[in-house]
Every structure is written in C-alpha cells, then in structure tokens.
C-alpha cells in the first residue's frame, strides 16, 4: 500500500511537471542556474541572487509567477541536505530589517502629528513583513502552490532540532498558513467508496491511527454504517487536510477490534443511537500546529445529527499513545512490594509461560501476554487505575501530559471510560498495554467543559474514571500499586 512518504514524493514529482509547464507557457524566461543537489557554497550565492530577483518583482505579475515557478523547480531538484541549506539561507538572509524597524518604532514614538503617525505606522507594518514571507507568498499564485508551501513546511519541521535559526522562519510560516487555512475557507466533504480512487488511496496513505492494509479493509470503513469526513481547502481540492472515521453503533464502543472487523455484519445506520469517532488523522505534516480537529468533530456531529436524528451519543474510541512509556518509567522509579500469593503466582506463571525475565515491564512487552487470562485478571484493575492517573497528570503548563487527552479535553469532551484490552494489535499493546479511552462529547456540555479546561485546567471525567483515579491515589499512598515480579526460588 502507498505510504505517506511515497505520497509526499509523488506530490513533489507532479509539482515539477506542473511548474515546468508554467515556465514553458511564458517562454521559459531566464535559464535556470545549474546547481548541485546538495547546494555547494557557490550554489548558495546563485540561489541568493535568484531570491533577490524574485523579490524585485520586475516585469509584472507574469514574470513574478515565472520566477517563483523557477525557484520552486530548483528547490524540488534538491536532496535533503540541499533543501536544508536552502531553508537556512531563507531564514538567515531574508528576515526583517531590524535596523529599519527600530528606526520606525523610534519615529512612531516621537511623532505628534496624526497624519504622520498613520504614515509611519503603515511603513512599520510593511517593514514587519519579512522578505522571506513576501517570497513565499508568491507561490500562492502558482498551480498547486499552496500544497508546495505546506510540504515545504513539512521539510522545515524535520530540520528544526538541528538549527534553532529555523524556528523564527517556522513561526512566520505558521502565521501565514493560519491565515490561509482559516476554518471559514474549508469545506467538509463526506468521502464514500464512490469517491475518486486517487482520494481513497490518500486515505490509506494518511491513516495515522489504525493502519489500512487493503482496499477491502478501506471499503469496510466506508460501509453504510460507517462515515468518513474530511476538510478540504479550495487551493488543495484533492488533498484532505484532516479526516475522521465514524462508526454508527448501538452503544459506546469498548473494543476497536470489533469496530474494524470486516466480517461482522453491518447495521442499519437509522437504528444507531451512538456515533463513535474511532480515528482522526492529520493528513498534512506541514500543517502541524494548526488546529482543525475541534471544528471537524463538532461539524461532523452536527451533520450526523441532522442526517440521523436518532443519534443521541457522540464519543471517541481513542488511543493513549504514551501510557506504556510512562508506565515503564514509573516501574523503574517507584519500586514495588510483594502482594498476596495468588497474585504473585499468576505473574510468575505467566513469566514461565512466555519465557521472559521475571519483571513486569519485560512481561508487558511480550506480544502475547494478553492471552493469559490469569495474568489479565491480575493486571486489569491496577493498570486501569494507573491509566486514569496518567490521563490526569499535567505538564508544567497545567495541561494534560497525554496529547490526545489535550486535544479532546480542549474541545470540551470528558474522559468517559477506560477500556481494558480494547486494542490488542501490536501498536495498541506497545503504546498503551491495549487500553483505550472513550471521550464523550455531550453537545450540551462541551462549551462549559472547554471553558473550564482552558481557564482553570479542569479535566472533566465521569464518576467511573474518577473512582479509578481515587483508587490509584489511595493505593499509591499505602504501597505501590503494582506487584513486583519475584524470581523463582531454586
């Protein structure tokens, strides 16, 4: 199946052809400089000169469009190192003119004349738009130019850790993209099996939560009791920005295997009372940090309510991506005391059965540990309690540690229920020991929950989840919540 990376390169390949057509249509213009794909120091000078020519905007709109297309073609011909050097050049040499800004700010402070004040204010506003942003905005006029910029930022994000200078370029980039991708510009579309094959292929490539391994599997996710919705931008009409997959069922789902099981018969959507959002995938890496998800879920919930008035409950079946990693750290730091003999016996028997070291962290990494009923009975209660504790833990900014929790709680949902062994696929076991969580979207409460979360850091949760949290806190105060695996005696 097509991967995200191969889809990404396919997009860049098509851009090369499109923009070659742009340059051909206006007579080719200046011949492109011959540059090495890694950008040598001499090549950097050529690119810098070409960027300045783009900014001078000589020859009117047609010439500007041509030069932007040529610059884009040069970028697309670069390898990873060359693209990084290109972006470093943009960040370093095409930032705002600080001296000019200081000068204008001083004039603004000193002027007493209203007309003069407005004139200086406008000049300052113009000066605050960096040359690099004016350069990037030129791509907006090109065919697929917006998609190019989104993918350009995806490249930029991959280099941020290596060069702090690029962070300022990224901040400006976000500001630009936020304006272009305002929610008012976006279109919500219902994707079905009859949608274009190229679009369906992108769903397979971009699915980030539960991998789609075949066309048959995709078809199952688009059956009559399923829905898939995506946001699109008018300048990227064939590219989903974010999409959500929904199951129309009779109750809040507690097991993703059943949701994804293509052998189970479909149900009549008219009889469903519950909509389960079981997968939300951001399709464009270059739009990271621009939040469409909260609008998407609320928009889809409203759309479904109109189509199926019998739907009363809207909830997710969500992953808990870093719970297992957090648990490993906890096991390492907090230590354990022995529990009762039956508990120890179940743990030791499981260690023997799976031929692994007698340590809980090791046992939980065994791919089949969940198939031992004695072991799962022993671990269910303490792991669910610890998972509740994890979901309520906060970072220094008073926001939940878990990214998925931050997203849904920020949208006004509440932590409704934790589900034991809800995802026994390899990824589910690696990320969260198979546990999944339902976030409930009570449409009458979401605004109140959102406000309490944003202003006071309040995490809305059901009584069931609160009880798990209290039990975890009480048990942890008395003694460690998880038993220690003891080595067998000789």
Task: Pin down the residues of each PLM region.
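Extended, composition-driven regions rather than compact fold-specific motifs
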Residues: 1-290, 294-490
